[in-house]
Amino acid sequence: MDLINLLFVSFWFILPAYTANAMACIFGGGKPVDLNKNFIDQKRLIGNGVTYRGTFFGVFFGIVTAIIQYLVSNLGFKFILSFNFTLIEYVIIGFLLSFGALFGDMFGSFLKRRLGFKQGQSAPVLDQITFIVFALIFVSYYYLVPSKISITLLILSPVVHILSNIIAYKLGLKKVWW
């Protein structure tokens, strides 16, 4: 597989996770998933930035993305995309990638609170990598992602994450660019 194809296939595979991450930001707000509770260190468990509404819509749109991927793959693009999943497999993988990505964000927020980072404060690497690591962990219970794709995503995702955050900031969807 050449580099361009590897980048495209990797991006195509992880797209439900990227979508979930973006839609959680766009549709977030409301009740935080930690219910304003503190951990044993008396700091918030996660913070106000991770909400039930954002999580629901993130996962929902991640699954919708997976369904669209299935439809596109059945338009004759299977030879490009390297995946031959059924509709139900796309839905399961879309759910696992989406929920895994958002769980990774929650875990990252949990770690940031323990390390003394305030909500919205940048934590380089942690902000960019936890969502992709957990998306890959969650999906691996159903589908073992080829190592080439996993490694590509671990390298590609921080760049995509930073660029998408800058775009969201410029569009007024985020308060900070990171």
Swiss-Prot record:
It is found in: Cell membrane. Its EC number is 2.7.7.67. InterPro entries: CarS (IPR032690), CarS_archaea (IPR002726). It comes from Methanococcus vannielii (strain ATCC 35089 / DSM 1224 / JCM 13029 / OCM 148 / SB). Coiled coil: none annotated. One of its GO terms (cellular component) is plasma membrane. HAMAP family: CDP_archaeol_synth. It is a multi-pass membrane protein. This is CDP-archaeol synthase. One of its GO terms (molecular function) is CDP-2,3-bis-(O-geranylgeranyl)-sn-glycerol synthase activity. Belongs to the CDP-archaeol synthase family. It catalyses: 2,3-bis-O-(geranylgeranyl)-sn-glycerol 1-phosphate + CTP + H(+) = CDP-2,3-bis-O-(geranylgeranyl)-sn-glycerol + diphosphate. It is an enzyme of class 2 (transferase). Catalyzes the formation of CDP-2,3-bis-(O-geranylgeranyl)-sn-glycerol (CDP-archaeol) from 2,3-bis-(O-geranylgeranyl)-sn-glycerol 1-phosphate (DGGGP) and CTP. This reaction is the third ether-bond-formation step in the biosynthesis of archaeal membrane lipids. It comes from the Archaea. The gene is carS. Its cofactor is Mg(2+). GO terms for biological process: glycerophospholipid biosynthetic process. The chain crosses the membrane at residues 7-27, 56-76, 91-111, 125-145, 149-169. Keywords: Cell membrane, Lipid biosynthesis, Lipid metabolism, Magnesium, Membrane, Phospholipid biosynthesis, Phospholipid metabolism, Transferase, Transmembrane, Transmembrane helix. Pathway: Membrane lipid metabolism; glycerophospholipid metabolism.
